[in-house]
């Protein structure tokens, strides 16, 4: 099933919106009962790289406990994730499909910059789901995104810091660290704070 989810305006840097999409550590706290839950809060070590041959960021070998990995999920599962960032304002997620565990569901976000601190996020999903109604699939994704929006609109600084001295990451932030390094290497400035104040 292909599900275009429509555009959602967000008062944040377009780069912050992409970075949030890549962050799994917030799942138990922001998407409680859906994409995560306590006490399953640990992010196990995973692999992140800049694939030089295609100039993309890839995060692989990610596993995370999810109470409801998709609308089609009937029980909690250990979900496998792979993230791909082919462009600064585009990210693609391949994740375990609950009804077909050997296959991937695909969720993508295309972020349209409006200003350096405002954007429109255009998510879509390609899923194996033969039981859910289209409206239910759309509502499931919109619920998750609206939970994210309240976090995104309150992050400080509003621009995404690219100077590693501006924020102190932890091990679970590895995808963000590599994404920011990749953006800096590409000379990204729009929506970014490039130096410490």
Q: Where on the chain are the PLM-derived regions?
A:
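C-terminal catalytic domain of Rieske-type non-heme iron oxygenases
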Residues: 1-197
């Amino acid at each position: 099933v292909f599900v275009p989810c429509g555009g959602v305006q967000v008062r944040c840097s377009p780069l912050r919106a992409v970075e949030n999409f890549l962050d799994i550590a917030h799942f138990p706290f922001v998407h409680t009962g859906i994409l995560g839950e306590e006490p399953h809060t640990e992010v196990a070590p995973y692999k992140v790289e800049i694939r030089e041959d295609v100039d993309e960021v890839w995060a692989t070998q990610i596993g995370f406990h999810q109470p409801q990995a998709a609308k089609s999920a009937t029980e909690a599962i250990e979900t496998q994730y792979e993230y791909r960032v082919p462009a600064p304002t585009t990210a693609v997620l391949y994740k375990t499909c609950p009804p077909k565990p050997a296959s991937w569901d695909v969720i993508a976000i295309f972020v349209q910059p409006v200003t350096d601190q405002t954007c429109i996020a255009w998510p879509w999903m390609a899923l194996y789901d033969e039981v859910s109604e289209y409206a239910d699939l759309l509502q499931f994704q919109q619920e998750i995104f609206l939970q994210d929006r309240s976090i995104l609109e309150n992050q400080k600084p509003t621009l995404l810091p690219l100077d590693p001295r501006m924020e102190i990451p932890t091990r679970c932030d590895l995808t963000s660290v590599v994404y920011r390094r990749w953006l800096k290497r590409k000379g990204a400035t729009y929506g970014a704070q490039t130096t410490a104040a």
